[in-house]
């Protein structure tokens, strides 16, 4: 039938880590979760030009550690780190606890589902034909080492009166295999004809249980 689970959610705890890592009592859980949502919304809005892929939030003791994964770290950091310090102060006001901000560069934005989805959405807003935008994104992803990619756009494509969905795929995208490293993200293009939704699936290969254990051991060794 038409029921499809979120590819990221179904892999949590298996080959995917949670975006927020902390513990809270039942009385404080909703408050902390709401803080995380507000912080992510604020950072995505503030760093709209920085190509932010994901934001990870950790809360060790009474502090917060935020890791921003971006394809343009220079925009986030600013000259001599001034911008990131201003950002830290603003996030501190939102959370009310000491905040540490780390920046990690996304080495291959062409195979990052979030960045690809936003790129396609931006092209649609600039009136680029949707098939051309999809084809260009797929070619760039396959050249950068992706094993497969699927892109779907939905809405009043090309200004048509009736909304429809179109999709294209290159390579293979095994959604049913849990060990398959499938990156999934969505974006929205705000056009004069209305909102066009963009969904992107990128298959990067398989992650075996032994490899996962090795990664965890490496992290422990680094600590």
UniProtKB/Swiss-Prot annotation:
Gene Ontology terms describing biological process: translation
Name of one Pfam family that matches: KH_2
UniProt-listed PROSITE patterns: KH_TYPE_2 (PS50823), RIBOSOMAL_S3 (PS00548)
SUPFAM superfamilies (alphabetical): Prokaryotic type KH domain (KH-domain type II) (SSF54814), Ribosomal protein S3 C-terminal domain (SSF54821)
GO CC annotations, alphabetized: cytosolic small ribosomal subunit
MF (Gene Ontology): mRNA binding; rRNA binding; structural constituent of ribosome
Keywords: Ribonucleoprotein, Ribosomal protein, RNA-binding, rRNA-binding
Domain KH type-2 stretches: 39-107
Family membership noted in the UniProt record: Belongs to the universal ribosomal protein uS3 family.
Role description: Binds the lower part of the 30S subunit head. Binds mRNA in the 70S ribosome, positioning it for translation.
Protein name per Swiss-Prot or TrEMBL: Small ribosomal subunit protein uS3
């Amino acid at each position: 039938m038409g029921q499809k689970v979120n590819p990221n959610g179904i892999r949590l705890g298996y080959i995917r880590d949670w975006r927020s890592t902390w513990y809270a009592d039942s009385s404080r859980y909703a408050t902390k979760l709401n803080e995380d949502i507000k912080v992510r919304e604020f950072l995505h809005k503030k760093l709209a030009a920085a190509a932010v892929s994901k934001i990870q939030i950790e809360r060790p003791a009474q502090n917060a550690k935020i890791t921003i994964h971006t394809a343009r770290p220079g925009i986030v950091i600013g000259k001599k780190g001034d911008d990131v310090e201003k950002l830290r102060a603003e996030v501190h006001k939102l959370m009310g606890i000491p905040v540490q901000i780390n920046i990690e560069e996304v080495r291959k934005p062409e195979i990052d589902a979030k960045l690809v989805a936003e790129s396609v959405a931006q092209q649609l807003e600039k009136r680029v034909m949707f098939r051309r935008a999809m084809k260009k994104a797929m070619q760039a992803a396959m050249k950068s080492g992706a094993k497969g990619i699927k892109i779907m756009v939905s809405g009043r494509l090309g200004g048509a009166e009736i909304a429809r969905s179109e999709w294209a795929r290159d390579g293979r995208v095994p959604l049913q295999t849990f060990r398959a490293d499938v990156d999934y993200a969505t974006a929205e293009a705000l056009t004069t004809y209305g909102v066009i939704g963009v969904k992107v699936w990128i298959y990067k290969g398989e992650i075996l249980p032994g490899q996962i254990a090795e990664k965890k051991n490496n992290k422990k060794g680094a600590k």
